[in-house]
């Protein structure tokens, strides 16, 4: 069974919950991950926001992979500028372990940048 943590909802099995933040606060996030484990979830697909990275909401979690689709100017109200926003997103890929994968969209000009310091197995698409 798989789980989902996204902007739209949190779901696993037949359970569905509203989600109010793309990446919930660390306590809420771990509560749902624990419930998923108890329900038999083996994998969780999680949307990780730049806010979640910057505010350490995912600190301590070990990801088996990450997917970069694109960067837009969506969160410049929170981040000082586009470079800061991009660098925060890059921290996620920098933190992936060697055993993880990084799947990157090369159609986005920031794709290659995300891979620069990542030790994860690298895959690309365009």
Task: Give the ranges of each region predicted by the language model.
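Local beta-strand N-terminus motif with an aromatic residue
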Residues: 1, 41, 63-64, 99
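Short beta-strand-centered segment that lines the nucleotide-binding/catalytic pocket of NTP-utilizing
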Residues: 1-14, 49
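Hydrophobic anchor at the start of a short beta-strand
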Residues: 2, 43-44, 121-122
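Acidic/polar active-site rim loop that often engages polyanionic ligands
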Residues: 9-17, 65-72
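Conserved nucleotide-sensing/catalytic segment adjacent to the nucleotide-binding pocket
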Residues: 16-49
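Short gly/ser/thr-rich secondary-structure transition/capping motifs
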Residues: 24-27, 46-52, 83-87, 124-125
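Conserved helix/coil segment N-terminal to the catalytic DExD/H
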Residues: 51-59
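Acidic, Mg2+-coordinating active-site environments of NTP-dependent enzymes
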Residues: 64-126
């Amino acid at each position: 069974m798989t789980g989902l943590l996204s902007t739209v909802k949190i779901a696993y099995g037949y359970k569905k919950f509203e989600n109010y933040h793309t990446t919930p606060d660390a306590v809420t996030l771990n509560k749902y991950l624990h419930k998923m484990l108890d329900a038999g979830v083996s994998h969780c697909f999680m949307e990780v926001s730049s806010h979640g990275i910057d505010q350490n909401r995912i600190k301590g979690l070990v990801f088996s992979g990450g997917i970069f689709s694109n960067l837009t100017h969506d969160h410049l109200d929170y981040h000082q500028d586009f470079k800061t926003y991009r660098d925060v997103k890059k921290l996620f890929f920098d933190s992936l372990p060697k055993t993880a994968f990084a799947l990157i969209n090369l159609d986005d000009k920031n794709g290659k940048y995300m891979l620069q310091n990542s030790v994860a197995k690298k895959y690309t698409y365009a």
